[in-house]
């Protein structure tokens, strides 16, 4: 409650929760640090706050999620009046990760792209049925509740990121990101020295990013 009060004072009016899944087995398999119980506790707490709206993240197309479970998750989050925005992503398995190792060792099955496509279609149908809009390939919202911050990414507007690993962009050709280590980040703030990595985008970099983002 104290944190929410502080956020209100700072003008924050939306909180994004990385639920990923509402299935304990799936959370464990994807090496998520939180539990289903913690997710539900956070949802129930934040849903009581009338000054805050919520965005949630979900993952589909996993080896552990059936079509019926996916429908159930989509319907479940609609029961929370504060949830006005959804980011939904198909699971991808990156090289040199625990999941990639498990696939290579046949511990878990590889991603079924046909299954992911079916669940993507179920998502589109659900969004249409509840009257929301799909305004980006992975982002959906109640009318009037697009993510302003994320929209800045897609429209190449400047943005500023706070916290460890947070990325910022000057709107032209400089992109920079903060120290990723929590302890080192806090120490840097205490010493008033804000170390960050900087990338200067070339004209080709910007053109490639423009094409990639606009395809979404």
Each predicted region: which residue ranges?
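C-terminal scaffold of the Radical SAM
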Residues: 1-216
């Amino acid at each position: 409650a104290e944190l929410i009060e502080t956020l209100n004072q700072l003008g924050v009016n939306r909180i994004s929760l990385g639920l990923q899944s509402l299935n304990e087995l799936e959370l464990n398999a994807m090496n998520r640090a939180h539990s289903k119980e913690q997710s539900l506790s956070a949802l129930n707490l934040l849903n009581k706050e009338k000054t805050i709206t919520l965005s949630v993240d979900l993952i589909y197309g996993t080896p552990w999620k059936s079509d019926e479970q996916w429908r159930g998750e989509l319907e479940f989050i609609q029961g929370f009046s504060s949830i006005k925005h959804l980011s939904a992503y198909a699971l991808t398995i990156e090289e040199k990760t625990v999941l990639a190792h498990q696939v290579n060792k046949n511990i878990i099955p590889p991603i079924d792209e046909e299954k992911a496509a079916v669940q993507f279609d179920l998502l589109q149908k659900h969004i249409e049925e509840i009257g929301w809009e799909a305004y980006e390939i992975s982002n959906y919202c109640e009318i009037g509740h697009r993510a302003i911050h994320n929209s800045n990414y897609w429209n190449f507007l400047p943005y500023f990121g706070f916290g460890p690993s947070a990325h910022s962009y000057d709107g032209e050709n400089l992109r920079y990101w903060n120290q990723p280590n929590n302890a080192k980040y806090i120490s840097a703030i205490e010493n008033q020295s804000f170390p960050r990595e900087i990338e200067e985008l070339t004209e080709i970099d910007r053109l490639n990013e423009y094409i990639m983002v606009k395809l979404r």
